[in-house]
Amino acid sequence: MISTVSLFWALCVVCVINMARYYSSLRALLVVLRGCDPLLYQYVDGGGFFTSHGQPSKQVRLIGYIWAQRYLDHHDDEFIRRCQRVRGQFILTSALCGLVAIGLIGLAIWH
């Protein structure tokens, strides 16, 4: 029989891998954004997005922009495709993090 602890750790590994994929896709989106829409790139602080002095309010703007699907009216097809990918990975990663939290609570109750 499969151990619940090993299943939990496997879920954690899958979650971390998806977080890395999300981070990579977000970086690629910012590179595309810098080329196709410099004003939006500045609006979301693309240059300082992944730095320690990045502005969280501007980072939340980009996430809100993607979550509300405001990118659908954009003129660049590559940018639209990247935004759809980032949105899908955000939903997947959020769901996996929720499962990890539920699994951790379940393990705390069981053991």
From Swiss-Prot:
Pfam families: UspB. Its main location: membrane. The chain crosses the membrane at residues 1-21, 90-110. It is found in: Cell inner membrane. It is a multi-pass membrane protein. Keywords: Cell inner membrane, Cell membrane, Membrane, Transmembrane, Transmembrane helix. One of its GO terms (cellular component) is plasma membrane. InterPro entries: Universal_stress_protein_B. Belongs to the universal stress protein B family. This is Universal stress protein B. It comes from Erwinia tasmaniensis (strain DSM 17950 / CFBP 7177 / CIP 109463 / NCPPB 4357 / Et1/99). The lineage of its organism: Bacteria, Pseudomonadati, Pseudomonadota, Gammaproteobacteria, Enterobacterales.
